[in-house]
Amino acid sequence: MNTIHVDVVSAEESIFSGEARFVALPGEAGELGIYPRHTPLITRIKPGAVRIEKEDGTEEFVFVAGGLLEVQPNCVTVLSDTAIRGKDLDETKASEAKAAAEEALKNARSDIDIAMAQSELTVMAAQIAALRKYRQKK
């Protein structure tokens, strides 16, 4: 069976390392699907869910808050400042953080404050969407 080695790494730890049949993740220009022997690629990724179809057919979900993707014919590497296993996502905390970001956006006075609040809001909305997608697959 053809597989591709996948590494998902955050600033703190390695979140996933193993063989997979397929990987899907949110690229900057849209959803990317990667199979073994994919053409080499380096691109930025948006906040969202990384779906890894493992060798045994089970799926692993990881939320990433953006980052970089490197694809080689036999290897996929996802680098993200923040990466959280699907099973570790907390919808209550994410919803509270999203509400705080919305409030910060309303009260923002400078361009920097607006940009920071918008960025946090985007990440939290993507985290909630990833959590819901993970729950549907369980």
From Swiss-Prot:
UniProt superkingdom: Bacteria
Coiled coil: none
Membrane topology: Peripheral membrane protein
Gene Ontology cellular component list: plasma membrane; proton-transporting ATP synthase complex
One GO MF term attached to the UniProt entry: proton-transporting ATP synthase activity, rotational mechanism
Compartment annotation: Cell inner membrane
Pfam families: ATP-synt_DE, ATP-synt_DE_N
InterPro entries, per database record: ATP_F1_dsu/esu_C_sf, ATP_synth_F1_dsu/esu, ATP_synth_F1_dsu/esu_N, ATP_synth_F1_esu_C, ATPsynth_dsu/esu_N
Keyword terms of this UniProt record: ATP synthesis, Cell inner membrane, Cell membrane, CF(1), Hydrogen ion transport, Ion transport, Membrane, Transport
CDD domains the UniProt entry points to: F1-ATPase_delta
Subunit structure: F-type ATPases have 2 components, CF(1) - the catalytic core - and CF(0) - the membrane proton channel. CF(1) has five subunits: alpha(3), beta(3), gamma(1), delta(1), epsilon(1). CF(0) has three main subunits: a, b and c.
NCBIfam families: ATP_synt_epsi (TIGR01216), PRK00571.1-4 (NF001847)
Family: Belongs to the ATPase epsilon chain family.
Primary role: Produces ATP from ADP in the presence of a proton gradient across the membrane.
Name under which the protein is recorded: ATP synthase epsilon chain
Organism: Polaromonas sp. (strain JS666 / ATCC BAA-500)
